[in-house]
A protein has these predicted regions:
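Extreme N-terminal segment that seeds HTH/winged-HTH DNA-binding domains in transcriptional regulators
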Residues: 1-33, 39, 87-121
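Short glycine/serine/threonine-biased micro-segments
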Residues: 24, 29, 60, 66-69
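N-terminal helix-turn-helix
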Residues: 33-65
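Short, Lys/Arg-rich nucleic-acid/phosphate-binding segment
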Residues: 34, 66-74, 78
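Short Asp/Glu-rich motifs
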Residues: 42, 77-78, 119-120
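Short amphipathic alpha-helical interaction segments
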Residues: 66, 85-88
């Protein structure tokens, strides 16, 4: 699936957000080798420098680490993965709340919508 980017946020931030989500969802297993910068840049159709910047962000967060010249790997540290999972969840909820506010939906109405949709899922 083609990667899509918006103009409201730096592309490397959007890439880091997407990859962070994929890591915490288990798309990339703890301890597994991560795809190369070049491979990911081709997949996302971005400059390798942009991808490198995004991956450096994930390294700073401790989600990825580099093993010499072998490449990057996903952390096996459950505390780091749990903290990242919580961050992804929190950011998602904040995004929903901002969108609801922009649409004039109160928090109570949002809760009602969620409960109603939950019944249909």
């Amino acid at each position: 699936m083609a990667w899509q980017f918006n103009s409201h946020e730096a592309v490397f931030v959007q890439i880091a957000t997407r990859l962070r989500g994929e890591i915490v969802r288990g798309t990339y297993a703890p301890g597994a080798q991560f795809p190369s910068v070049r491979q990911l840049a081709l997949e996302a159709a971005v400059n390798p420098n942009t991808m490198q910047k995004a991956l450096c962000c994930l390294e700073e967060e401790g989600l990825l680490y580099t093993k010499g010249t072998i490449g990057r790997f996903v952390t096996s540290d459950t505390a780091v993965l749990d903290a990242a999972r919580e961050r992804v969840r929190r950011d998602s909820v904040r995004s929903w709340l901002r969108q609801a506010e922009e649409l004039g939906i109160s928090k109570q109405e949002l809760i009602q919508y969620i409960q109603k949709e939950d019944e249909t899922v």
